[in-house]
A protein has these predicted regions:
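Feature captures the FAD/FMN-dependent oxidoreductase FAD-binding
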Residues: 75-142, 284, 298-299
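Beta1-alpha1 glycine-rich phosphate/pyrophosphate-binding loop at the start
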Residues: 7, 12-96, 205-214
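Rossmann-like dinucleotide-binding core of oxidoreductases
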Residues: 6-37, 129, 134-282, 289-292, ...
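Helix-loop-beta segment of a Rossmann-like dinucleotide-binding subdomain
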Residues: 64-78, 116, 174, 260-271
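Phosphate-coordination loops involved in phosphoryl transfer and adenosine-cofactor binding
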Residues: 2-4, 102, 174-175, 300
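Glycine/threonine-rich phosphate-binding loop and adjacent beta-strand/alpha-helix elements that clamp
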Residues: 52, 177, 319-389
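C-terminal, flexible cofactor-proximal segment of oxidoreductases
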Residues: 7, 209-213, 357-497
Length: 497
């Protein structure tokens, strides 16, 4: 029998981890507490934050793994299609027989020569098994974080207080006055859905973010903003220049919020933040969504805002993020990684030098889709444990963790392209533009599609160049290798001493 690896969770992270570990000769065993695979994308009420009418805000090209494309031609996919895709992926790689459905993990602890995984299936069936290695792939989007607001527990509106995680449909809110707390993706998606279906909607927020439409000039926005150039620029140029470059892209694509009647965001995109939504700002401009400062107190059905104004509501829906929650880790592991509701000490979100044979997946918070970085993280784990790439230097790992600890208390949100290239470099599969002169523009300013990470390094594919050229040209985005004037100027900035 080969080296046994327990993978906790059979959502996107767990499935792609199993695929790449199996390719390296490991014997992965997935544990999934729900009765079906897919994680959040099952859409099960009370167990996931995905509601039936939800669509992705990332394109089909960047919401897929490298070995299996989506069926059809829709740019943005409904949640049910993502769930079907994950089932196809599991079948394609023969993973379904490796998944124990309806099995929850109650405890993970260190054993004499590996890791002990304690599980429960059914009402009274308990088990404990030893594995050589463990991948924790449950994700970080299970425990909604509703901020403390004085008097919130006394709210008397008939629709009550809930979170976007528990939202299922606009129907119960039809004709009601609804306050939506937050300005991130889920909050704005639900605010727009409610406004379209008969609710009187107010959004309350701490700060105004820039809002990037999902489509800009016919091209998905995640193809334009999450690029390799953005990472190279951040590494080589002054932060203010990168900030201005990204802000210009966002504002040119969708305007600035104050143009629609929303508050004026901070001039710095990094300080304000950015979110994706196609309809939110037009609905603000039409008066179908109103924007208020953050709420400061609640008394009965009445809410007081930061500017002293008050308004009564029938329901409140918070979309204010999640707490990191891994209750099955034993005390030793929790103490080693200093786990709290926000932070987890791990080198590049993955390994801890004092926990050999244990890896974490998908435990960071980012803007942009997770599929591409998750696959690259899975490859790094598989290549490291399989001996394809050198294991991380322990001294460097400790230094990286120390640097991370120094940033505790600061904003933790990162971006998809930064994370993807971090893992690609660690896995040895970052594409080298010098090897592909015919793809230079696409590799710099095009989408970080899964196909580009099969050009060079381990598991490179002979057809990857053609596949990536098609992905970059999709939606009419990059159909020639001639830089635009802005791209040429941006590229020359990187060449400056």
């Amino acid at each position: 029998m080969g080296t046994r690896v327990a993978i906790i969770g059979a959502g996107p992270a767990g499935l792609v981890a199993a695929r790449w570990l199996a390719a390296q000769g490991f014997e992965p065993q997935l544990f999934e507490q729900m009765p079906e695979l897919g994680g959040q994308w099952t859409g099960r009420a009370g167990a996931t934050g995905v509601w039936p009418q939800m669509y992705t805000n990332t394109s089909r090209i960047l919401t897929a793994f490298g070995d299996l494309a989506h069926d059809g031609s829709n740019t943005f996919l409904p949640a049910a299609d993502i769930h079907r895709y994950l089932n196809r992926y599991a079948e394609f790689f023969g993973l379904t027989d490796r998944i124990r459905l309806g099995t929850s993990v109650s405890r993970i602890s260190r054993g004499n020569s590996g890791w002990i995984v304690e599980t429960r299936s059914g009402a009274e069936q308990f088990d404990a098994e030893q594995f050589d290695r463990v991948v924790i792939a449950t994700g970080r989007f299970h425990r909604p974080d509703i901020p403390p607001v004085p008097g919130l527990e006394s709210f008397t509106g008939p629709a009550g207080v809930t979170s976007t995680y528990h939202y299922r449909s606009s129907a119960p809110y039809r004709g009601m006055r609804v306050l939506v707390g937050g300005c991130a993706v889920s909050a704005l998606e639900i605010a727009t859905e409610l406004a379209h279906h008969g609710a009187d909607v107010v959004v309350t927020q701490r700060r105004q973010r820039y809002v990037l439409p999902k489509f800009a000039a016919g091209v998905p926005s995640d193809h334009r903003i999450f690029t390799r150039y953005g990472v190279l620029a951040e590494q080589r140029l002054p932060k203010a220049d990168v900030d201005r470059y990204l802000r210009d892209i966002v504002v040119e694509a969708g305007g600035s919020p104050e143009q629609y009647g929303a508050p004026t965001p901070d001039p710095s995109l990094f300080a304000a933040g950015v979110t994706l939504n196609q309809q939110y700002l037009p609905l603000v401009a039409e008066g179908r969504i109103r924007v208020r400062p953050w709420l400061t107190s609640v008394a009965g059905a009445q809410v007081t805002f930061g500017d002293g104004s008050t308004e009564s509501f029938d329901g409140i829906v918070f979309g204010t993020g999640f707490r990191l929650d891994l209750p099955f880790l034993d005390d030793e592991i929790r103490a080693t990684v200093e786990l709290d509701g926000v932070h987890l000490d791990a080198d590049r979100y993955t390994f801890h030098p004092d926990l050999p044979g244990l890896a974490f997946m998908g435990m960071w918070d980012q803007s942009g889709g997770y599929f591409v970085p998750l696959e690259l993280q899975a490859r790094w784990i598989a290549y490291t444990w399989g001996g394809v790439v050198e294991p991380p230097d322990l001294t460097a790992q400790r230094a990286a963790i120390q640097a991370y600890r120094a940033r505790r208390g600061q904003p933790q949100k990162t971006r998809m392209n930064l994370v993807a290239l971090t893992f690609a470099r660690a896995a040895g599969c970052e594409p080298e533009p010098a090897h592909w002169p015919q793809l230079r523009r696409a590799l710099l300013f095009g989408p970080l599609a899964p196909s580009c990470f099969r050009l060079d390094g381990p598991d490179a594919l002979p057809g990857a160049a053609d596949a990536f050229a098609r992905d970059a040209a999709a939606f009419g985005a990059i159909t020639s290798e001639d830089f635009t004037a802005r791209e040429q100027m941006s590229w020359e900035l990187l060449q400056s001493p």
